[in-house]
């Protein structure tokens, strides 16, 4: 099962993932750590697409091996969420604006989610 924890920067995604991961015994991928491993800090639409597909690839590997996996990342658009293709979505709707204006402008509130915090 792929769980996406999404929301604006500073909304608490990583905080929640850190606490949920041991409770579920899940694999966990944090977007900043994955970007660091890939040395890819491109936040253009193309860069965000690559990141979503990168996160999907890591999560799918865990899912195929019957592990629950948590991915925490902004996943700002309907398209990036569709590409990632989560089984469950937790939307952290805890702040009105994040610290990056470009992300605030790009962010689309999800129409589909399982939990909204």
Give the predicted meaning of each segment.
Residues 17-60, 64:
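Conserved substrate/cofactor phosphate-moiety recognition/catalytic segment
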Residues 45-100:
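Glycine-rich phosphate-binding loop used to anchor ATP phosphates in small-molecule kinases
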Residues 13:
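Conserved lysine of the Walker
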Residues 8-9:
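The conserved Walker
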Residues 2-4:
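Short hydrophobic/aromatic beta-strand immediately N-terminal to the Walker A/P-loop
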């Amino acid at each position: 099962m792929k769980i996406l924890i999404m929301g604006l920067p500073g909304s608490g995604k990583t905080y929640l993932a850190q606490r949920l991961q041991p409770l579920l015994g899940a694999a966990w991928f944090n977007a900043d750590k994955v970007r660091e491993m890939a040395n890819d800090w491109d936040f253009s639409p193309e860069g965000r697409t690559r990141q979503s597909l990168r996160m999907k690839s890591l999560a799918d590997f865990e899912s195929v091996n019957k592990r629950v996996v948590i991915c925490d990342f902004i996943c700002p658009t309907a398209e990036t969420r569709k590409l990632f293709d989560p089984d469950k979505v937790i939307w952290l709707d805890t702040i009105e604006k994040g610290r990056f204006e470009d992300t605030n402008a790009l962010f689309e509130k999800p129409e589909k989610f399982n939990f909204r915090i």
